[in-house]
Every structure is written in structure tokens, then in C-alpha cells.
């Protein structure tokens, strides 16, 4: 109930005709007086952690940000990271919220045009060295592939154990390369999502490329001819140091139109529509 109460202003603004937050009396939040925001024993209990997350977003919006529907501004992300820093005392929980925030906002944006200030703020606030290394790798990966440039060539391996040049596979085609690891995304989700996207954007070749995990196991419910994996010596690892999921969109001329898209983001649709209509 309290999690929904914290989210109420955001939901209201999303569906209100004028798109503004509702006017709320201070007494509406009196229940906060009875809630501990730093209960270590509850922090990994989903209803509690969801409440804390909604509270942090609500507090950040209260700093004067306008409602945001499709993506968060860099300023909002920075303010949210600082809100987490000031409100959460448990170090492990603070680091977890910081990590989840910077990653989810980056993937939601679905673009290689990164928010430098947000990432810099995360690296300053987090005390988890493993997380900081992951995020730094993510930043470096995003900068390694730039829009309007040719995709660097690299080899992929099919499930007959034959190596192929990616440039030959996608030559004269609009392509969506999805680099994935079972550590971060399930096969069932990939099947559902790629089937959906393939039906809606028939002029794009969707190619999942496995970058980690058991390379012998392909995705059973997708066409084997469009599935590949990376051998350990593939040059693709130069822009996949984080090992996190990454989508790259390339047009028929071999030019990158999005170097770091998210397969799950709503903001991906405009890029796919543009690519699907490319002659």
C-alpha cells in the first residue's frame, strides 16, 4: 500500500491530461513517520525494497523535476543518485540502489549517447569496486562504437562451428545485432522479444550473438541460421568488456545508427522504425 502511495503522484501525472503532478497535502505522507528507511533485514524483501525505490523517486521529483514519461534526464538521474546517497545509510543497500539506477536509466535511454555526469556521479558515490569496474567498462563499451561510422569487423561462430565475418553476414541488410549473456537475460525473454520485433519490423535481420556462458547451447526456439556466438579471441570483445547485453543497429550501407540500444526499452522503437524503412 505504501509503495503505491509513493508512486501515486507519478502515476497520476502519467495519465493526467495536463501531465502535471497532483497537489498533495503534507499529511498524505504521515505514514513515513512509522517507516524505517534503513532496515537491513528487510532490504532484500521485494515489497520493502520496492517501497524504498518509489520513495527515492518521489523525493527526487519533489526537488522540482517535471514528470518524465519515456526517459529520465541526466539532471534527474544525478539528483536521484544523490538522494540515494543522502537517504540510505546501509552501505551494501546504497551501492545496490546506485548500481541499479545508473544501469536502468542508461538502458532505458537506449542510446550510445551517454549521460557523462550521471556516470561520474555514480563512480564518485559508490564504494563497491566491482560495481565501479562494471560501470566503467559499460561507459568504455558505449564509446567504442559510434553512430554514422562503419561497424568494426569481427568474427562470429555459427552452431556448425564455422567462423564468419560479421560484415559478410549483414552485407546489404538492415541488421539488429543482439549481444547477450545468460547471466543477464533469459532465453525465453529473447525468444519472445525477437519474435515480436521480427513480426513488426520485417525488413530487419535480427541476429542474437551469445557472448558468455555455454557456447554449445543455442536458443532452441529461434532459427539456428541467425544465431551465433563469440569465440574467446573475437575482436568483438573490445566493445563488450562489461559482458552486459547490447544491441547494435546497422543499416544496409554498414553504418551504425545506434551503437548501444536496449532490446527491452520503449525508446528502441523509433530506431527500429527508422531502420525498417531504410531502402
Regions flagged by a language model, labelled:
Residues 159, 178, 201, 244-245, ...:
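Exposed, low-structure sequence patches enriched in small/polar residues
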Residues 183-223, 232-235:
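Structural microenvironment flanking redox-active thiols in thiol-disulfide oxidoreductases
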Residues 164-194:
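Short active-site neighborhood of thiol/selenol oxidoreductases, capturing the structured segment around
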Residues 1-159:
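Oxidative protein folding and maturation machinery
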Residues 219-253:
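Short, internal strand/loop/helix patches
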Residues 252-279:
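Thiol-/selenol-based redox modules, centered on thioredoxin-like
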Amino acid at each position: 500500500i505504501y509503495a503505491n502511495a509513493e508512486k501515486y503522484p507519478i502515476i497520476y501525472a502519467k495519465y493526467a491530461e495536463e501531465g502535471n503532478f497532483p497537489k498533495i497535502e503534507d499529511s498524505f505522507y504521515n505514514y513515513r513517520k512509522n517507516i524505517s528507511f534503513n532496515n537491513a533485514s528487510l532490504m532484500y524483501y521485494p515489497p520493502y525494497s520496492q517501497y524504498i525505490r518509489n520513495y527515492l523517486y518521489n523525493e527526487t521529483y519533489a526537488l522540482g523535476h517535471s514528470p518524465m514519461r519515456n526517459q529520465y534526464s541526466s539532471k534527474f538521474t544525478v539528483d536521484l543518485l544523490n538522494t540515494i546517497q543522502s537517504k540510505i545509510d546501509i552501505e551494501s543497500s546504497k551501492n545496490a540502489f546506485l548500481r541499479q539506477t545508473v544501469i536502468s536509466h542508461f538502458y532505458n535511454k537506449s542510446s550510445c549517447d551517454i549521460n557523462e555526469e550521471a556516470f561520474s556521479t555514480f563512480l564518485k558515490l559508490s564504494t563497491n569496486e566491482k560495481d565501479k569496474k562494471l560501470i566503467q567498462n559499460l561507459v568504455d563499451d558505449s564509446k567504442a562504437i559510434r553512430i554514422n561510422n562503419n561497424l568494426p569487423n569481427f568474427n562470429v561462430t555459427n552452431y556448425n562451428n564455422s567462423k564468419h565475418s560479421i560484415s559478410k553476414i549483414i552485407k546489404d541488410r538492415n541488421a539488429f545485432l543482439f549481444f547477450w549473456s545468460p547471466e543477464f537475460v533469459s532465453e525465453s525473454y529473447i525468444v519472445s522479444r525477437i519474435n515480436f520485433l521480427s513480426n513488426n519490423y520485417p525488413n530487419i535481420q535480427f541476429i542474437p550473438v551469445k557472448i558468455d556462458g555455454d557456447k554449445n547451447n543455442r536458443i532452441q526456439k529461434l532459427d539456428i541460421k541467425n544465431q551465433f556466438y563469440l569465440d574467446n579471441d573475437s575482436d568483438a570483445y573490445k566493445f563488450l568488456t562489461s559482458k552486459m547485453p547490447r544491441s547494435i543497429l546497422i543499416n544496409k550501407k554498414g553504418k551504425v545508427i545506434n551503437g548501444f540500444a536496449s532490446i527491452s526499452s520503449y525508446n528502441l522503437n523509433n530506431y527500429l522504425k527508422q531502420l525498417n524503412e531504410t531502402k
